[in-house]
C-alpha cells in the first residue's frame, strides 16, 4: 500500500477503519518514546546516604551518559526526579514544589528504603512514610542504601516504561 495512489473509495474505507490514523499514530508514538527514553535528564533530590550511591552511579564506572542520562541541577531542565533518602514533613512541601516546576512529561524514581516507605525512621513523627504520598512515583529502587547497579537497573526500567507508553 505504501507508494500507491489511493482512490476515493479506498481512502474512505481506510479512513473509516482507522487504518491510516492508527498506523501513523503508533509510528509517532514509537519515535517520540524512543527519543524520550534515550535522553533522560534526572534532577537529584538527595536527602541522605542514598545520594552518595546516586553520585557513584553517575561516576565513570557506570557512566550513565552512555545511556543518555545526564544530571541537571535545575528542575526546569529535568524530566526525571530521583528522590534519595528520608523525606521529612518539612521537606515534603519543597519536594512537591520542585516536582511542579519540572517540565512535562515528568517521572519520579524513589531510591532507597527511606524514600520508598520511611525506612529506618518509619515510626518517627516527622517522617513521611514514602514519597509516593507527595508525588506520583514511577519506579521504586529497593535497598538501604541501594547499590549503584540497582539504581542503574531502575533507570533502565524507566526507559523501558517510557518506550511502552502511548502518547496519542
Swiss-Prot record:
Name the positions where [4Fe-4S] cluster binds: 49-50, 114, 144
User: What remark does the entry make about the cofactor?
Assistant: Binds 1 [4Fe-4S] cluster.
Record the organism: Wolbachia sp. subsp. Brugia malayi (strain TRS)
GO MF terms listed in the record are: 4 iron, 4 sulfur cluster binding; iron ion binding; NADH dehydrogenase (ubiquinone) activity; NADH:ubiquinone reductase (non-electrogenic) activity; quinone binding
Membrane topology, from the record? Peripheral membrane protein
- Give the catalysed reaction(s), semicolon-separated: a quinone + NADH + 5 H(+)(in) = a quinol + NAD(+) + 4 H(+)(out)
UniProt main location, coarse: membrane
Listed under subunit, the entry gives: NDH-1 is composed of 14 different subunits. Subunits NuoB, C, D, E, F, and G constitute the peripheral sector of the complex.
The Gene Ontology CC terms held by the record are: plasma membrane; respiratory chain complex I
Its biological purpose is as follows:
NDH-1 shuttles electrons from NADH, via FMN and iron-sulfur (Fe-S) centers, to quinones in the respiratory chain. Couples the redox reaction to proton translocation (for every two electrons transferred, four hydrogen ions are translocated across the cytoplasmic membrane), and thus conserves the redox energy in a proton gradient.
Q: Name one GO biological process term.
A: aerobic respiration
Family listed:
Belongs to the complex I 20 kDa subunit family.
Q: What is this protein called?
A: NADH-quinone oxidoreductase subunit B
Amino acid at each position: 500500500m505504501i507508494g500507491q495512489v489511493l482512490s476515493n473509495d479506498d481512502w474512505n474505507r481506510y479512513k473509516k477503519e482507522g487504518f491510516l490514523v492508527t498506523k501513523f499514530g503508533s509510528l509517532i508514538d514509537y519515535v517520540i518514546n524512543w527519543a524520550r527514553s534515550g535522553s533522560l535528564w534526572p534532577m537529584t533530590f538527595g536527602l541522605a546516604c542514598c545520594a552518595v550511591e546516586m553520585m557513584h552511579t553517575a561516576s565513570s564506572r557506570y557512566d550513565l551518559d552512555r545511556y543518555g542520562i545526564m544530571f541537571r541541577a535545575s528542575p526546569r531542565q529535568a524530566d526525571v526526579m530521583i528522590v534519595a533518602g528520608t523525606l521529612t514533613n518539612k521537606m515534603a512541601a519543597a519536594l512537591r514544589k520542585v516536582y511542579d516546576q519540572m517540565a512535562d512529561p515528568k517521572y519520579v524514581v524513589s531510591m532507597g528504603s527511606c524514600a520508598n516507605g520511611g525506612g529506618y525512621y518509619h515510626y518517627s513523627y516527622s517522617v513521611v512514610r514514602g514519597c509516593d504520598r507527595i508525588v506520583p512515583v514511577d519506579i521504586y529502587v529497593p535497598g538501604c542504601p541501594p547499590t549503584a547497579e540497582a539504581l542503574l537497573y531502575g533507570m533502565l526500567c524507566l526507559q523501558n516504561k517510557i518506550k511502552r507508553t502511548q502518547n496519542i
